[in-house]
Amino acid sequence: MHFIALIVAVCVAFAGASCPYSSGGIAAPPCPKNYLFSCQPNLVPAPCAQEAASYGSAGAYAEHIPFYVGYPNHQQVEQYQERIARAALIDGLRGLTQGIQDQQY
């Protein structure tokens, strides 16, 4: 285990000695002057949005707060099952009516 650590340390030392960190000879390009965001220190914050009359003082940032529903109670489950059964019955009656109309012609 110590041998592997020694080999890794030697490799790191050799790599550090063979790769000197010197600045390159390429200069940075000049700062652009006609862009919205540049490297010049004269940026100013954007102005605040005007108050919208229909939203009141909240402006356009008003949004509904989501809430999480819990488990449905027994009555809600029964109402849901009744609606599903009624929808299936209506769908079946539509199919039956369509079949009768197709047979008449």
UniProtKB/Swiss-Prot annotation:
The keyword Methyltransferase does not apply. GO terms for molecular function: structural constituent of vitelline membrane. One of its GO terms (biological process) is vitelline membrane formation involved in chorion-containing eggshell formation. Keywords: Secreted, Signal. The keyword Amino-acid biosynthesis does not apply. Residues 1-17 form the signal peptide. Pfam families: Vitelline_membr. GO terms for cellular component: egg chorion; extracellular space; vitelline envelope. It is found in: Secreted. It comes from the Eukaryota. Residues 25-62 form the VM domain. Belongs to the vitelline membrane family. Major early eggshell protein. This is Vitelline membrane protein Vm32E. It comes from Drosophila ananassae. The lineage of its organism: Eukaryota, Metazoa, Ecdysozoa, Arthropoda, Hexapoda.
